[in-house]
Amino acid sequence: MGLFDRLRGNDTPRVAFIGIDGLSHRLVADNPDTFPTLAAIADEGDGGPIDSAVPPESSACWPVLTSGVNPGETGVYGFQDREVGSYDTYVPMGRDVQATRVWDRATDAGLDATVMNVPVTFPPQRTVQRMVSGHLSPDVDKASHPDELREYLTESDYRLSVNAKLGHQEDKTEFIEQARETLDARAEAFNRYVEMDDWDLFVGVFSTPDRINHFLWGDYEDGGPYREDVLEFY
């Protein structure tokens, strides 16, 4: 049984938000056989290209996506922001997001939320039943709540992200292998807590596709040596 089958659950109303970071709508549209589930969702429901937030930087976009308001209200404009009234800079984290996130609305309404690997959520919030923070978090140990989640992720060699240094090497073999391992471990963790938790809202983000696209998209577009590796990864 796949992740999407597990998410269907019973008749109790609930919401699952699955993020696939960096996935191009054009890539799905041009390769429906590679993406049968997403292609079916687009055919039976809706799908299409979307415009990014302004500025189009990941650290600004994820708070926008999870709060529904623009950077002027989230207070996060990029990977590095400036302290008000000075030229000192800092890296925005979850505590710097000034807007209410969707899981905050759920918990405020007395609902249970499980949140996994969303960027710009460090440190993990103790107000939700389970959270592992995403990109820019220092390590799994500090990014996980509660203890059971921390212990499971540590024992299963769960990675918060792929080692980008590998992507800069001329031979991308090790980078691609680690990307696959990271994706598999994340899918396994998502499956575990989709089944284990009594959740009303599940939010999980696969960030590895974004890393693949950063380093291999040119090969896909131009017919480079790693073009087929991109499609095989997906």
Locate the predicted segments by residue.
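Active-site-proximal N-terminal segment of extracellular/periplasmic enzymes that hydrolyze or transfer
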Residues: 1-49, 56
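Beta-strand elements within well-structured catalytic alpha/beta cores of enzymes
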Residues: 12-28, 41, 65, 106, ...
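Generic recognition of stable, solvent-exposed alpha-helical segments in well-folded globular domains
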Residues: 18, 23, 33-36, 60, ...
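Acidic/polar loop patches that form or flank catalytic/metal-binding clefts of enzymes
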Residues: 48-51, 73
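Short Gly/Pro-enriched turn/cap motifs at secondary-structure boundaries
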Residues: 53-54, 93
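Glycine-rich loop at the start of a catalytic domain that most often binds anionic cofactors/ligands
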Residues: 60-70
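His/Asp/Glu-rich, glycine-adjacent segments
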Residues: 70-227
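A short acidic, glycine-rich active-site loop
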Residues: 227-234
